[in-house]
């Protein structure tokens, strides 16, 4: 049964909106927050949809762990990098910031060499850390500002210096939130003293360990968006914090699928915000908690399905390799299969030499043999040549 928001109940002659509000607000399971939304005390009613999302997330997380354990480490590492790149491109895209997979991929490669140059270094570094389950402090306004500074401040300063935060931690002036069509949908809280007060309360919600983690993450995500503490970079900061928290609660790779899932359901995402901010909804944040929890579960489903498909493809390719490829070339073909299924561009000669522990001369000799068999796909991108398995030829060749 779809959760009926109070605004709709108010306009429905068949509903008693006051009675529905009283029942939810006074339910013993309801979580009352120390803040208000559009002038009404904020609360979350523990609807069945929330419990269903929590249970489903726990089950899918186990499925993802099982699939990860069944994949070679090289394949998993490559796929994590690919997910990380996609996540950053999409979180930028949602905010109207243009970036490409290649651009983010190059920053990631430089990061692995301890090279801090380049645009988007901060956001790439932050997301790359998620796979190690770092402990990022999120207890004070200063902590939130530190995340913002590391993540997007440099990019905001380049884009428009006037959007750099001008208060102790946050902005000091009014800001209007607009949707993708450029229509104002929300005014952020002001002045900074109130932003600080509201953010402190939101952080208290986030750190209340008596509550389910996904519930707290969803609530904080809403409250951060409602407060809108910065002039620019709010969405990217908010989604990163959610990704970080989810990567701590579930398998780390799950945190790299949040922006993709939000982008897939962007209308549902924004509509959930607007429903809860409406005065007639009377402070009930439950619709957003349900929507955001479902979006997170969908992110986990997407990941599970992708890993399942890639595991199936890899098993099939390895089986064909055992029949079609001469034994001395099989480990090289396995590396090419991994690059084909789990990366975007493929793999370079340098990476193949390191993975296979081969000299350049031996590698090129074996690549030449695969080329003669028709199993090698090559593409020059910039100065580098990337290699993949020629899937069409490999699949058409009779066993």
Residue ranges and their predicted role:
Residues 1-399:
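FIC/Doc superfamily catalytic core
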């Amino acid at each position: 049964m779809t959760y009926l928001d109070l605004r709709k109940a108010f306009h429905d002659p068949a509903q008693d909106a006051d009675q529905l509000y009283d029942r939810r607000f006074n339910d013993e399971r309801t979580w009352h927050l120390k803040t208000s939304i559009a002038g009404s005390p904020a609360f979350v009613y523990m609807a069945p949809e929330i419990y269903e999302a929590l249970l489903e997330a726990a089950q899918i997380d186990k499925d993802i762990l099982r699939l990860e354990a069944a994949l070679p480490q090289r394949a998993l590492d490559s796929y994590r990098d690919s997910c990380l790149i996609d996540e950053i491109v999409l979180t930028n895209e949602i905010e109207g910031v243009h970036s490409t997979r290649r651009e983010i991929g190059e920053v990631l490669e430089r990061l692995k060499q301890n090279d801090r140059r380049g645009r988007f270094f901060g956001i790439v570094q932050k997301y790359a850390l998620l796979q190690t389950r770092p402990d990022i402090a999120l207890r004070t306004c200063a902590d939130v500002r530190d995340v913002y500074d590391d993540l997007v401040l440099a990019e905001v300063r380049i884009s428009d210096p006037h959007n750099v935060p001008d208060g102790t931690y946050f902005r000091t002036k009014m800001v209007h939130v607009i949707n993708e069509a450029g229509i104002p949908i929300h005014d952020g809280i002001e002045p900074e003293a109130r932003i600080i007060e509201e953010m402190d309360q939101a952080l208290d919600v986030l750190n209340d360990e008596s509550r389910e983690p996904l519930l707290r993450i969803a609530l904080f995500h809403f409250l951060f968006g409602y407060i809108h503490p910065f002039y620019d970079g709010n969405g990217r900061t908010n989604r990163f914090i959610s990704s970080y928290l989810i990567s701590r609660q579930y398998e780390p790779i799950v945190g790299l699928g949040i922006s993709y899932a939000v982008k897939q359901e962007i209308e549902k995402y924004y509509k959930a915000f607007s429903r809860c901010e409406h005065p007639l909804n009377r402070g009930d944040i439950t619709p957003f908690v349900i929507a955001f929890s479902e979006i997170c579960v969908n992110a986990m489903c997407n990941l599970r399905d992708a890993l399942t498909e890639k595991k199936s493809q890899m098993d099939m390719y390895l089986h064909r390799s055992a029949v079609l490829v001469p034994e001395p070339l099989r480990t090289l073909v396995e590396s090419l299969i991994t690059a084909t299924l789990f990366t975007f561009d493929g793999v370079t000669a340098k990476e193949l030499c390191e993975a296979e522990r081969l000299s350049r001369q031996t590698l090129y000799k074996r690549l030449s043999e695969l080329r003669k068999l028709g199993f090698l796909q090559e593409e020059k991108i910039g100065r580098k040549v990337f290699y993949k398995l020629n899937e069409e030829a490999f699949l058409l060749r009779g066993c």
